[in-house]
């Protein structure tokens, strides 16, 4: 129903929104539940979810590829919690994990109950299957993974981005120039975590300011 077309998004180059195509919301029957299906931007606006509820949706499922930035997981859970609470419906949010060129997706799929509380969560930056059970009255049951610390989350994003960029492009590894400074040392540490030490080679490229200890 809604198409993002800003920043890294260019959806209108490839798609026409369901609204423009004259298509209504998608509500399907799954194991005795009427489930409203939202895609990406749909979940951030009121109308798509309200339209699904008007067709009898008892729960919402959101499929999404939402680019990572610091604090995004918390923003996402808060926004979807507000959506679920305003409608009185449980919501399950299935999210992409991995890197695609310069964009990184952090996973951490989750479910909130009809009161907007997080009731299930998958791990960040990990390929996982999150199993949730929808119960009468809008309750949700499932495992809740603990979120990463801010520092660990940033590190995981950097490692994920490098690993998938190298792997998806079919590169055999990486060669890194070291100056002796902390910046290139940090790049080396990220590369080793992402690819393994056997796939990383270094070349010392000192400057007049490189200290002897760097050797």
Model-derived features: positions:
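Enzyme catalytic cores with a strong preference for nitrogen-chemistry domains
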Residues: 1-177, 188-199, 212
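Catalytic nucleophile loop
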Residues: 184
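Conserved G/P- and acidic residue-centered "switch" motifs that form tight phosphate/ATP-binding loops
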Residues: 181
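Short, proline-centered helix/strand-breaking motifs
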Residues: 90, 205-208
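ATP-dependent adenylate-handling ligase core
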Residues: 207-215
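Short beta-strand "acidic-cap" motif of Rossmann-like dinucleotide-binding folds
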Residues: 202
